[in-house]
């Protein structure tokens, strides 16, 4: 039940990402004229690189323990520009006491291609030098008073500590760049009060970006200058905050020797601070003073200017990798958070739509097996207490039933709720109110380990796991008996039997808590059952799509072209096919009939213009050969209502149905990308999606027309078929949802981009939730990439697949804009045809599709 990570597979993948190859060693021996000294130098460098990278992989695998954490690492590795990964503020004591550990952690990040912006302080060193000279450090509100003598010491300390850290990094093969000036411009904070202390007015990003772009880790001090060049001292926490405001990194980390904020009353480390709920009371605590108070104030002000999902972690240097790459984190996490709200009746929910949207996370409700209305009716008839944050990213409902043990009836969380640990806050609040609790979870729940950690005991039956805490042996035994004798089987989908959603007069049975991640309901059939060679006949394959399909078949391990037919090219050698010497023929109806009768063709591919292939299909039908299959690339049979044709979009249509079909209609290029981009949101759509599609001129075919006239297209964009385009009908028909589609042709050769406006139920989804929906729906799909950024059409040209990204929600929260790109000749035609052929012949679905040409987000 607990997921295991294939660390060998991750290791292989990571070595590829780090470009581990023998090139370093090959280069050593390539130049025979190199001196022995130079050869030894290169060998040493290569060995350092190999061992440091191997060590990096081992460190990563030791710190990552679950699939979700692997995904989190890959997300950070690919989703942001390098300078936006993290801002790390290093306390001065770390450099003095834990320099080697700090250098090792930063080297780890460097070797996996992540470039944090490092800014260090030097407080303890300054105090030590000042005390040696008999100068007593002075502070006001946690700010060091900096007179000229103190500034002399401050500057000296900063330069020394900066050099120490840079030198330590260089010794272990990390390129580091000292940046001790030129980043922060400041004015006097209060010259009379603090003297040479600055208030930062602007941040110059150029030195930082230049360092990262050159492959160096930037190592900054918090010294600032006025416009006239006067050095000013700035608190390192404040400077780190200004950097974070400017770069908006994924992670903001403060490293200190205590590994977090220590509660001065209890001596314990504070694990989390939710500022919206705790800030004012926290500042009143007697132990919150000096640097601690300044740090909390600065972080509070910083987070007001960043997305609510942002947070600051204050940790020990040894926990840096754990904080960056795991869900568990370490140290003290400070975030804005939300105030937690308790409710005891439906009337207490000020926004009913927010409640309904939260309940839609329950799979029974989401799939329509149970309605929101029926569950609300149940809640109205029982005594319950709900727990949630303000936006209901997490909603927990505890049902109280007479003398029975209270039951956690719902625990519904968005992915945001899990990643921000709101779930822990909610559960802790429940434990304060209920000394005893029970709940049931499906054994396939992705968060099962979390539930085990919250319970005192568990009992499993028929795919469901009963959890509890706070029960003695007799109470636990009684609860297990009740659970064991209940009518719940391996599933709770039959609500009538379980009594889960029946009327108020009936007893409500156990109901599983729902937080598991949705997975792909139609996974790829990557592993084939057959390896016997099959023969393909191409009818009319003289255009761009035909050329690409021929190239794919030429590289396919089990497919051979036996016939290729074209009236215009009859008698010419088939170009681009190297397995055999094939010559174009001009097959007539009688030839088709003869070949079909003699079992000479396993797959017929109709690559003909719309409205042309019917006589060929009818002839194949007349023979009634059960062994052959037909794949039609035209639009002729995409609207079939007879049941004879199957629509071949494997990512959205049942793959087993496609595999068993005699006749497969290959989807259109525009239609494929649009359906992939819209389908996962169908249940949230509140109006007509509008699709602005632009294709390269190869989509207009090889026959000359204004739509493939390169002179007319130069510096131009030509709209056509403004309404009722055949792909508009195709998209609407397949989605069961009317869409508006306007195609355009542009001056590039191949590739399509869609910008799609989708009306959604107001406030139902955030951008992140939408992206998560797409990632879950297309999990495991090799030909679909989900990207946080809007994809570019130039990146998809020549690549196999669809890229979907953008996911921008408007300020009114009732419209999302999604961008999708596809190569119209490949996944929009030839590659998709090959997928359908593979499925029909029981090959692996991706056989013959070159993996090096798959696009990745």
Curated annotation (Swiss-Prot):
Classification via SUPFAM superfamilies: Carbamate kinase-like, Glyceraldehyde-3-phosphate dehydrogenase-like, C-terminal domain, NAD(P)-binding Rossmann-fold domains
Origin organism lineage: Eukaryota, Fungi, Dikarya, Ascomycota, Saccharomycotina
Entry-linked NCBIfam families: argB (TIGR00761), argC (TIGR01850)
Pfam families, per database record: AA_kinase (PF00696), NAT (PF04768), Semialdhyde_dh (PF01118), Semialdhyde_dhC_1 (PF22698)
Active site: 669
PROSITE patterns, sorted: ARGC, GNAT_NAGS
Domain named N-acetyltransferase: residues: 341-492
Places the protein is found: Mitochondrion
UniProt key word Cell cycle: no
Region Disordered, annotated ranges: 509-532
Origin species: Candida albicans (Yeast)
Keyword annotations of the record: Amino-acid biosynthesis, Arginine biosynthesis, ATP-binding, Kinase, Mitochondrion, Multifunctional enzyme, NADP, Nucleotide-binding, Oxidoreductase, Transferase, Transit peptide
GO biological process: arginine biosynthetic process via ornithine; L-arginine biosynthetic process
Similarity comment: family membership: In the N-terminal section; belongs to the acetylglutamate kinase family. In the C-terminal section; belongs to the NAGSA dehydrogenase family.
GO MF: acetylglutamate kinase activity; ATP binding; N-acetyl-gamma-glutamyl-phosphate reductase activity; NAD binding; NADP+ binding
Matches recorded under InterPro entries: AceGlu_kinase-like_sf (IPR036393), AcgluKinase_fam (IPR004662), AGPR_AS (IPR023013), AGPR_type-1 (IPR000706), Asp/Glu/Uridylate_kinase (IPR001048), NAD(P)-bd_dom_sf (IPR036291), NAGK-fArgBP (IPR041734), NAGK/NAGSA (IPR011241)
Protein name per the record: Protein ARG5,6, mitochondrial
